[in-house]
Amino acid sequence: MEMKKKINLELRNRSPEEVTELVLDNCLCVNGEIEGLNDTFKELEFLSMANVELSSLARLPSLNKLRKLELSDNIISGGLEVLAEKCPNLTYLNLSGNKIKDLSTVEALQNLKNLKSLDLFNCEITNLEDYRESIFELLQQITYLDGFDQEDNEAPDSEEEDDEDGDEDDEEEEENEAGPPEGYEEEEEEEEEEDEDEDEDEDEAGSELGEGEEEVGLSYLMKEEIQDEEDDDDYVEEGEEEEEEEEGGLRGEKRKRDAEDDGEEEDD
């Protein structure tokens, strides 16, 4: 597949301005030159063109935000000065497996002031005597050559290396994600537990008060019922007494009349 078609495929219905990473490995460069890549990819930070039969960087567009460039397994032999002009913020450059033979070719990379890591594996230049010492002396801005620093310490993973410049932002994000300091959640939990205990105490007090009110209410009602019954009994007793009095009065009047009748009979 030609590079131009590969780019259109990798866009995936996005505009070039939205693309930050672009992988064009194993496609075909017509006449060994870059095709289909232009200045509209202004947000591009990572570009990979490995094994695409690339021989010239002359048509590389301006990519000011580009930080990582993969150009391994091509047939590039020179013209590296274009990189400093078009990609001034490069931090990582992989030229492994190309046709780079001389230190003079690599010298053009001195103007890449932000370059930290350079790979030249399987290039003829690696066969030079004191190759590593010469490269570190020539390109004093780089920290890692072919994956190791001058003390033979291995370079970190590419992702960690890519994040070096953004460590401060990452720390801030981690702090935000970490949330409140240690002990803060425990204090909150203790406060919540205290609030819950207070609520429970209030509920218990309320329930006790409710029970007391119920007891008072029941006793009051019972007293009222008893009083009503007593009043009813008094009313019944009073009624019976009145009836007895009336009956007694009637009997007295009868006796009086009987006595009067007896007196009249004696007079006769």
Swiss-Prot record:
Residues 215-268 are annotated as: ZID domain. Residues 149-216, 226-247 have a biased composition (Acidic residues). Residues 123-161 form the LRRCT domain. It comes from the Eukaryota. Expressed in peripheral blood leukocytes, colon, small intestine, prostate, thymus, spleen, skeletal muscle, liver and kidney. Transmembrane segments: none annotated. It is found in: Cytoplasm; Nucleus. There is a cross-link at K68 (Glycyl lysine isopeptide (Lys-Gly) (interchain with G-Cter in SUMO2)). Its main location: cytoplasm. GO terms for molecular function: histone binding; histone chaperone activity; phosphatase inhibitor activity; protein folding chaperone. GO terms for biological process: chromatin organization; regulation of apoptotic process. Residues 149-268 are annotated as: Disordered. PROSITE patterns: LRR. The modification N-acetylmethionine is found at M1. Pfam families: LRR_9. LRR repeats lie at residues 18-38, 43-64, 65-87, 89-110. Residues 248-259 have a biased composition (Basic and acidic residues). Belongs to the ANP32 family. The H2A.Z-interacting domain (ZID) mediates a direct interaction with H2A.Z/H2AZ1. Interacts with the importin alpha KPNA1 and KPNA2. Component of a SWR1-like complex, composed of EP400, KAT5/TIP60, TRRAP, BRD8, RUVBL1, RUVBL2, ING3 and ANP32E; the complex does not contain SRCAP. Interacts with H2A.Z/H2AZ1. Histone chaperone that specifically mediates the genome-wide removal of histone H2A.Z/H2AZ1 from the nucleosome: removes H2A.Z/H2AZ1 from its normal sites of deposition, especially from enhancer and insulator regions. Not involved in deposition of H2A.Z/H2AZ1 in the nucleosome. May stabilize the evicted H2A.Z/H2AZ1-H2B dimer, thus shifting the equilibrium towards dissociation and the off-chromatin state. Inhibits activity of protein phosphatase 2A (PP2A). Does not inhibit protein phosphatase 1. May play a role in cerebellar development and synaptogenesis. This is Acidic leucine-rich nuclear phosphoprotein 32 family member E. It comes from Homo sapiens (Human). The lineage of its organism: Eukaryota, Metazoa, Chordata, Craniata, Vertebrata. The gene is ANP32E.
